[in-house]
């Protein structure tokens, strides 16, 4: 009797996971990060320029979403763009997970390929549902690895095309996290030096060059002096003033603080495993060490069961180390698995150099490393292979369950899941469900913006302070601030920015309670001081709304004027 092909069943399981995520994407309304990532493309749509008009360091990946936003705006405006972006990312992640799954099926059993693809699909940095640069960085990094693997296994024209597409994915990943370019250049240079990989590397280089050419010709401003001045301002961003090395060291210190005991347990497991291999029969010599690792992983997963989405990957990475070392000693190294782990390390380091969020930064590269670890342990065929495969499968399944559970139950920048009972019906967040309080605040702000749009021309620039990125999506007014991210009235960057840019005709000072959530009580805390605040007090007229104080410049252009 012919044995059934289980690959389609596991592909169906990935599809079911994606459907659950698609439904979960209806819940929660993030007032800050999620809409902030969309405003980069919105500024391009308004005719503003990268670097010259936007002074935030993570702006470059906006060119990836800009064509999609342009089409969406032409068809629907910005109504419901939050939900559209979320579902679009879930769809893209599902497609990428299937591609990863069928790629890994060439190396390991379908069960392990499913676990690896599920680990990717269940991850989202910060549980942010839209296409953040974190999530896109992970997606393009994994796609480049899959294309390279399929390219090495293929031949003829298809091989070159896959490596060319691999290069395009690497270029997109660099747009998401520019520091990743350091590792791409290093690895590509090494591949070009080896005769065996030179041709493939040249194809990949072609893809990178095409991506770079499109970015330079279509999106980078031609004002070199302005670009250099803008880069100086970007590098002096007050939220990123520590520098890349200090961010990396801070991330390492945070990991040591959080996972010191786990690291000690992993070392103990390695020592027990080594002793078992020396003094016990080979068939079950690895069992005591793996048992210690399994107990340590279980305790740690329980400890961090409600932590940041992705923290469970630390346990997988740490407690797989004894098994990986054993594979190394036995000479059972799988090159694709090793390269995936190296890619994960490079992605984690690039992210740590870019971000000041400490231990969270490494979680972007950890899924790739974890997939490489599971791929290695699940492919061992010697005496210890059965024990290692069982250990890797159980641990990967546990991490998958914890991560997927966090993805479903945790809510970023909104109330608990059971309080998201109000469905928004208008504006950029239409279709999302949020708390009754946030729904009321959202309605007040939309009414305020409608009133302003009825009175003032869309040529006027607007500035929301301290933070309301979705306001720039809801209003027809272009952004009049250095960035849509947290910018207080006292920010010293405002004075520098308005030396070369138009001062906003409309300034919206939000009430401090606007957008507050259990994990961020002071979202719109402000500081009423500095030259810009004094300018508002002296020369702008004031309009009071329930949600904000609005200041109108005497130079504001009336609608129809």
Give a label for each model feature.
Residues 136-155, 162-170, 317-323, 369-372:
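Specific aromatic-rich, kink-prone transmembrane helix
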Residues 95-122:
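Transmembrane-helix signature of polytopic, membrane-embedded enzymes
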Residues 125, 147, 160-178, 184-189, ...:
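Membrane-interface alpha helices of multi-pass inner-membrane proteins
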Residues 128-137:
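Short acidic/glycine- and proline-prone juxtamembrane loop motifs at membrane-interface regions
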Residues 153, 182-216, 277-280, 379-383:
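Perimembrane helix-loop-helix junctions
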Residues 38-42, 53-77, 87, 173:
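Short hydrophobic/aromatic helix or loop-helix immediately within or flanking a transmembrane segment
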Residues 147-172, 198-206, 291, 335-345:
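Short hydrophobic alpha-helices at membrane interfaces in multi-pass membrane enzymes
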Residues 56, 178, 406-487, 503-515, ...:
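Short periplasmic/luminal acceptor-recognition loop of GT-C membrane glycosyltransferases, typified by
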